[in-house]
């Protein structure tokens, strides 16, 4: 599933085609994706103009001049093919790293804009979805109401992390993946941030808070590394694994800089460490870490 850097990369790729553009025609080629489309979905979009294309955690939100916002979630394999007004295609060739999962038969939503651009949503597995909600109710809607802080925002610092994790015996990695606490972190970047911080993924999350609730030095370092990993990943265009690629069809490059993710048996890249990268399973997901320098 695309994580925060991949979704942010998609947002940046879609913005030139969508921001300031008016929906001329919306074609639905099936009645549902993961969920049924909202009532009168196409009708409510047609004639409206996109004022802003934003991101909340792993979701895209297009704020419309009608007072509603279009929520877009990519699911496991969702992608957008963009055809610009000049006829250039921002998604040429094979979108996927391992085979063309997204064939034209999986083009489920076609959004034609008055400026001549066309954005097509393709989703082979149909785990993605679209919704329309009043913009004023966006933060309290069912998708976002229980969502935690944005990891790249100023709302997350060492003190906030300590407050969120205080007295929790939950394994640190599981706490970081809890979208009710911090919204947008996923398996890849949590593994990478924990390694950079020298923290074991099974460490109790509460260990990052002092008895008085203040953040430990490790809590502050972890926040710093989370922000650094995400920022670097966005700059690299995300990570291409199986189902994710950028809107222009190019593959994200951050996977070439993985220190631990999917590198079992490799030497730890930390200077002075003689350890190897190992793997454990937590919550049904693979966790990659250095068996020597990531301490409990």
UniProtKB/Swiss-Prot annotation:
Disulfide bonds: none annotated. DNA binds at residues 106, 125, 168. GO terms for molecular function: 8-oxo-7,8-dihydroguanine DNA N-glycosylase activity; class I DNA-(apurinic or apyrimidinic site) endonuclease activity; damaged DNA binding; zinc ion binding. The active site is at 2 (schiff-base intermediate with dna), 3 (proton donor), 58 (proton donor), 285 (proton donor). Its cofactor is Zn(2+). Gene3D superfamilies: 1.10.8.50, MutM-like, N-terminal (3.20.190.10). A zinc finger (FPG-type) spans 259-295. One of its GO terms (biological process) is base-excision repair. The keyword Hydrolase applies. It catalyses: Hydrolysis of DNA containing ring-opened 7-methylguanine residues, releasing 2,6-diamino-4-hydroxy-5-(N-methyl)formamidopyrimidine; 2'-deoxyribonucleotide-(2'-deoxyribose 5'-phosphate)-2'-deoxyribonucleotide-DNA = a 3'-end 2'-deoxyribonucleotide-(2,3-dehydro-2,3-deoxyribose 5'-phosphate)-DNA + a 5'-end 5'-phospho-2'-deoxyribonucleoside-DNA + H(+). This is Formamidopyrimidine-DNA glycosylase. The gene is mutM.
């Amino acid at each position: 599933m695309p994580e925060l850097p991949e979704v942010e990369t998609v947002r940046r790729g879609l913005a030139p085609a969508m921001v300031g553009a008016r929906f001329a025609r919306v074609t639905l080629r099936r009645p549902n994706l993961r969920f049924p489309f909202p009532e009168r979905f196409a009708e409510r979009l047609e004639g409206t103009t996109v004022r802003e294309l934003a991101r909340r955690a792993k979701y895209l939100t297009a704020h419309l001049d009608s007072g509603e916002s279009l929520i877009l979630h990519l699911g496991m394999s969702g992608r957008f093919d963009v055809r610009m007004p000049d006829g250039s295609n921002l998604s040429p060739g094979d979108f996927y790293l391992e085979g063309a999962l997204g064939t034209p038969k999986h083009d489920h939503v076609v959004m034609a804009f008055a400026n001549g651009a066309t954005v097509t949503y393709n989703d082979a597995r149909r785990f993605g979805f679209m919704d329309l909600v009043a913009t004023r109710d966006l933060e309290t809607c069912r998708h976002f109401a229980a969502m935690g802080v944005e990891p790249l925002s100023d709302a997350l610092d060492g003190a906030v992390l300590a407050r969120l994790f205080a007295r929790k015996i939950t394994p640190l990695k599981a706490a970081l993946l809890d979208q009710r606490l911090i919204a947008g972190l996923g398996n890849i970047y949590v593994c990478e941030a924990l390694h950079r911080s020298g923290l074991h993924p099974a460490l109790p999350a509460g260990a990052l808070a002092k008895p008085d609730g203040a953040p430990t030095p490790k809590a502050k370092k972890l926040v710093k590394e989370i922000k650094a990993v995400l920022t670097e990943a966005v700059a690299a265009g995300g990570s291409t694994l199986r189902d994710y690629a950028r809107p222009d069809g190019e593959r994200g490059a951050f996977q070439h800089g993985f220190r631990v993710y999917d590198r079992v048996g490799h030497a730890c890249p930390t200077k002075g460490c003689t350890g190897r990268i190992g793997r454990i399973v937590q919550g049904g997901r693979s966790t990659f870490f250095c068996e020597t320098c990531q301490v409990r």
